[in-house]
A protein has these predicted regions:
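Charged, alpha-helical scaffolding/interaction elements associated with membrane systems
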Residues: 98, 110, 427-429, 496-497, ...
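Extended non-globular scaffold/tether segments
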Residues: 401-412
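Short, Lys/Glu-rich amphipathic helical modules
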Residues: 419-437
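Hydrophobic side-chain positions on well-ordered alpha-helices
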Residues: 107, 421-426, 490-494, 775
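Conserved catalytic cores of very large enzyme subunits
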Residues: 174-399, 432, 436-439, 443, ...
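Generic structural signal for well-ordered, non-membrane alpha-helices
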Residues: 87, 102, 127, 412-423, ...
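Feature captures hydrophobic
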Residues: 1-171
Length: 901
């Protein structure tokens, strides 16, 4: 019989007894109740794993073991336990017992709870607990949502009619313009001011549905790829031979594309859907898919970004999909191969950096013009010719064969769509819709196998290819590129066939509707994120960046008819995805174009993002890229520049909390929130170890270098995991360089390779360093020890010092030359350090200073700073100065503009 009484010899607490008692209840439930026990048996067999529970001082140390369909409790933690939950204290353990799911997330984020070992088994364990406690958890979550709604209503009790009236007024007060752009051939009023959303009932219906849709977890992709792998093997094939990774992926991809449902969305002009649901969340099992295992019952009830899920999807994911992929995903592959390395442990504490390669490597832009101009059949012919070259080795031939298999799969899907469109047309009673479906069937017989001939075919080819790319790579940051440039030739070719002004006007309206339909199709999917990510990233969308305007590869004006058509659609729909970016080149692009960008941004109150072409080209030029390719850049994901169709830039490989390095420098290498003596010991402030400001700056950079080195180490390991678990042969066929090299894009096949980091907290670090330099060393108004004590106590005991910091120190954004120089010093150090690190795919590591919504998450996980920012408050977003830096917005703008590109 299990002894549940605390053992004084082991110094275990009463909490240990309490936890063992509760675990015994859990074990009894799964042992005695068939309705619970059935969840322990999956297609892979019994769920066999051990979960340990302990505290930092080991006052609690016990485990629950699931094996052979039975559960038992141990009074110790076996060495072979798959996962151990480590609580900061007994109080934290007790807190978890009454915690809501949201409370549990914040316990992880705030280091009251950390995890050692296999995250998948942790999620499986919490799923089993949710089976047992389903009703209680759902009740808690409903209460949380009610409280959240109440708080929101308290902050804004009534609808802001003044704001909605203002936006409506902006939409009514649209500008007109005469065409002044040399490459705009057919738009007399390039602003297309006569059109409103009311002129496009199809688009208005789509938009209304989008604004009320709740995404649903879609099981199609994981079901099909899991089925194929179970039949054909993963590590080895049916005959026991090791799979070549790209070939394995390509065969599975082809099976997926041949067997997924060909759906024509209701009333759409475009063929195909990203998922089998009207708006679906794709489960990528080798990426981050298994992270929602613990939420299969609760995901419809969470406060932020709830997703619906059917009973059948829940059953399929738990019993068939997740057990198969539990060890075959990026995170766990690295953990097993490299024995839970320190770099991974740091990432899983959430407060220092986050590595996106745990989920995807998809921040890039495919060469869409290639498939539009050649069609898949000609691409296959070219790749086949490359395979026959005598200098090709076995690995290169396998990679090239994998590209062919993927292109064949894409063609099969397009043919299936053609057949579906034909069937839908035969059943359609409305003659107008019937004709549209018949045209769709014809288009899908032409593209993607053959070149596009019309704008209608080109947009359909784009969309089908886009679906195909998202069947291979996660829908996060994969971007669309310069669609106005790539679609303009088809627009011109169509217009040249039309003679009468009336027909041309009707065609322009149809082109607007077609592009609008494309925008709305891009909203038919949503990233599948665990609830923790909602607090970490703020519910980010897929970030499908689209880029307009700027200059051509030759340096000429790139603004054309399609540029303005895309801007019209952007104005009317005002969507966050696609993420529209506009390039503007001074002295090349017209004032007409610039005014239109400003007008659309004003009407939508959000978009497009506007980029100075000259500054971006200047920033990219030192990288050694061909100038024509630099001029052809597009935004990726959020705003990051990538060379279109030639560059695996993975511009957002990681989110880096630079403030963590500052905190560690202030604490001799210890990270305060995690209470972890992590970095090098660089000096104790209280002991007066820093005689000069430069000595402290050196300590800061040493801590930052330590964090960067660990993050890059993890990035390399995850890159290796991608090469084995999920090479991307279809994407590789659309990135220049891969075919010539016979290499997958994950293995350095692209013509240009790089990875980019998003550094968060530049203004906060700069201001903190300015306070230390000016008040401690230059003016000697406060000792470093006194400043640190104020920081450690959140300035609660020294409001006078807080006022001095905020009002008497020249901060970034105040107009101070010295503050700008400090910001440039910090940014240059980061740039130079990353630039010197060898890249596993070749190329460079690049730096950027933007934050998505990470400035909030990292700020929540950081203490007070010398800058006067208080504990838990958000950092400033991107390059934005502190709000108290200056009363003048112009000072803020000028200081940001004076940062070195």
């Amino acid at each position: 019989m299990l002894n549940l009484i605390p053992d004084a010899k082991t110094k275990k607490s009463f909490t240990d007894y309490l936890i063992r008692t509760l675990l015994a209840v859990v074990a009894a439930g799964f042992n005695l109740m068939p309705s619970l026990n059935r969840y322990l048996k999956t297609e892979e067999g019994w769920l066999d794993f051990t979960v340990g529970i302990t505290t930092e001082n080991e006052s609690v140390a016990c485990a629950i073991v699931f094996a052979g369909g039975k559960a038992k409790v141990l009074g110790e933690i076996p060495k072979q336990a798959e996962v151990v939950l480590i609580f900061k204290s007994d109080a934290a353990v007790k807190k978890l017992l009454g915690a809501t799911p949201t409370d549990q997330i914040f316990m992880l984020l705030n280091s009251e709870l950390r995890v050692r070992g296999h995250m998948g088994y942790m999620n499986a364990f919490f799923f089993l607990l949710s089976v047992l406690m389903n009703k209680k958890q759902i009740s808690q979550m409903k209460k949380e949502r009610a409280v959240s709604k109440k708080e929101l209503l308290k902050s804004e009790p009534e609808k802001r009619k003044d704001l909605s009236d203002e936006l409506a007024s902006r939409r009514r007060s649209r500008l007109k313009a005469q065409n002044t752009d040399a490459n705009v051939r057919y738009l007399d009023d390039p602003y297309l001011s006569s059109f409103t959303i009311e002129d496009f009932p199809r688009l208005k219906t789509f938009l209304d549905a989008h604004l009320s849709a709740i995404p649903e977890v879609c099981p199609e992709l994981p079901s099909l790829v899991t089925r194929w792998h179970k039949q054909n093997g993963f590590e080895t094939d049916k005959d026991g031979r090791p799979w070549q990774p790209a070939l394995r992926k390509a065969h599975a991809y082809k099976y997926l594309m041949e067997n997924r449902r060909p759906i024509i969305a209701e009333n759409s002009l475009l063929a195909g859907t990203t998922t089998s649901r009207p708006v679906g969340c794709i489960v990528y099992p080798e990426g981050s898919g298994t992270l929602i295992w613990n939420e299969l019952f609760t995901i419809p009830h969470r406060t932020h970004n709830p997703f619906s899920i059917s009973d059948e999807t829940r059953r399929l994911l738990h019993f068939e999909v997740f057990p198969y992929w539990n060890r075959r995903n990026f995170r766990e592959w690295v953990r097993e191969k490299y024995s839970n390395p320190l770099c991974q442990q740091i990432d899983e504490r959430y407060a220092l950096y986050f590595s996106w390669k745990q989920a995807t490597i998809s921040h890039t832009i495919p060469d869409f013009p290639k498939i539009l101009k050649l069609g898949a059949s000609e691409m296959i012919a070219q790749i086949s010719a490359e395979m026959e070259k005598p200098e090709r080795d076995e690995q290169q031939r396998a990679n090239l064969e994998a590209m062919i298999l993927c292109l064949e799969g894409l063609c099969a899907y397009s043919k299936n769509l053609a057949a579906q469109a034909k069937q839908d047309a035969e059943r359609e009673a409305n003659p107008v819709r019937k004709q549209e479906l018949e045209e769709l069937a014809k288009a899908c017989h032409q593209v993607v196998e053959k070149p596009a001939r019309t704008l209608f075919e080109a947009v359909n080819a784009m969309w089908i290819t886009w679906i195909g790319l998202h069947m291979e790579s996660m829908n996060a940051g994969l971007s669309l590129g310069r669609l106005d440039q790539w679609l303009q030739p088809y627009f011109l070719a169509d217009m040249e066939k039309i003679s009468s002004p009336e027909e041309k006007a009707a065609y322009i309206k149809k082109a607007i509707e077609l592009v609008g339909d494309f925008f709305m199709r891009c909203t038919d999917h949503f990233p599948l994120t665990p609830d923790l990510a909602n607090f970490y990233f703020g519910g980010s969308s897929s970030d499908q960046a689209l880029t307009l305007g700027g200059v051509t590869p030759d340096g000429g004006d790139a603004v054309n008819d399609m540029t303005y058509i895309f801007l019209k659609v952007t104005e009317m729909l005002s969507l966050r995805d696609p993420n529209v970016n506009a390039r503007y080149m001074p002295e090349v692009n017209s004032d007409t174009y610039l005014k239109r960008l400003c007008e659309v941004n004003l009407i939508t109150a959000a978009t497009p993002s506007m980029h100075n072409d000259r500054a971006i080209i200047s920033a990219l030029s030192p990288m050694g890229y061909d100038i024509r390719d630099i001029r052809d850049w597009s935004a990726t994901g959020c705003v990051e520049p990538t060379l279109s169709g030639k560059h695996l830039s993975h511009t957002n490989m990681q989110m880096m909390n630079m403030v963590a390095a500052l905190e560690m420098a202030l604490n001799n290498g210890r990270h305060p929130l995690t209470d972890w003596q992590l970095g090098p010991q660089t000096g104790i402030v209280e002991n007066g170890d820093f005689r000069t400001f430069d000595e402290f700056f050196d300590a800061f950079t040493r801590q930052f270098a330590f964090i960067i080195d660990r993050s890059i180490e993890y990035n390399h390991m995850l890159g290796e995991a991608h090469q084995y678990l999920r090479p991307t042969p279809f994407l590789s066929s659309l990135i220049e360089g891969c075919i010539d090299k016979g290499a997958d894009v994950t293995g350095g096949g692209a013509r240009y390779n790089s990875s980019g980091t998003a550094i968060v907290g530049l203004a906060d670090v700069t201001d903190s360093l300015m306070v230390i330099k000016k008040l401690v060393y230059d003016e000697r108004k406060v000792t470093f020890a006194a400043l640190k004590e104020a920081v450690d106590t959140n300035f609660e005991n020294d409001p006078a010092l807080l006022a001095l910091v905020r009002k008497k120190t020249p901060l970034f954004g105040s107009g101070s030359e010295e503050a700008v120089a400090m910001a440039n010093r910090v940014a240059k150090w980061a740039h130079d350090y990353y630039d010197a690190i060898p890249h596993y795919r070749g190329g460079k590591y690049t730096t950027g200073f933007w934050s998505m919504s990470q400035h909030v998450a990292f700020g929540t996980l950081s203490g007070a700073l010398p800058s006067g920012r208080l504990r838990g408050k958000p950092f400033t977003p991107g390059l934005t100065p502190q709000p108290f830096a200056s009363p003048s917005l112009l000072d803020n703008i000028r200081d940001v503009a004076r940062l070195d590109p």
